[in-house]
Regions:
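Intein/HINT protein-splicing elements and their conserved insertion hotspots or analogous self-processing inserts
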Residues: 1-102, 113-169
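A structural-propensity feature for long, helix-poor, extended segments
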Residues: 104-106
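Carbohydrate-binding surface patches
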Residues: 109-111
């Protein structure tokens, strides 16, 4: 059975060479963070526009290999999701751990093999599939299982395959 599903599409024009996916691509790359506004009743559109302009300028001047907007799970969620795709880990130090799981508007986490001035470098990607935040190490396989496990009942990825072919009239 298929659960009730809403499918929506957004269309825009963009140079496909500048479109980035969120997953980390290689070990040893620098991880950068542009903090956004904590989710609040009032939206600081000037900060959000400034962050987008800053990220666009960085992307124009430097090699950016992966990027993700910080969403409802905060910067730690963005980092965890970035490790899942290619099972590349990360070691980061966050100054404000109290708000690391707070939803944000207009924040970005991105990676680059280059040193980039004027933006907060929070860590590096790592070959081992772990996420280390301020010295606390989380196993990437356990994080990924916990993340995917909550969706397994709705969108199963494992099922018993029928061994007999049904007759088609």
């Amino acid at each position: 059975t298929v659960p009730p599903t809403l499918v929506a599409f957004g269309v825009t024009t963009a140079d496909s060479r500048k479109v980035l996916s969120p997953e980390f691509k290689a070990a040893g790359e620098n991880i950068y963070y542009i903090p956004g506004q904590a989710l609040a009743q009032e939206i600081d559109f000037d900060l959000i526009k400034s962050n987008f302009a800053k990220f666009e300028a960085i992307q124009a001047d430097h090699k950016v290999t992966a990027a993700s907007a910080v969403k409802y799970g905060g910067v730690v969620e963005a980092l965890a999701l970035a490790t899942f795709g290619n099972h590349i880990g990360a070691t980061v130090t966050l100054e404000n751990l109290e708000t690391a799981l707070t939803a944000q508007l207009g924040g970005f986490v991105f990676t680059s093999p280059e040193d980039i001035a004027g933006v907060a470098k929070i860590g590096q990607t790592a070959a081992d599939f772990t996420l280390t935040v301020n010295g606390v190490t989380l196993d990437g396989h356990k994080l990924d299982s916990a993340f995917q496990g909550k969706l397994e009942e709705v969108y199963p990825t494992e099922f018993a395959q029928a061994t007999e072919l049904e007759e088609v009239p």
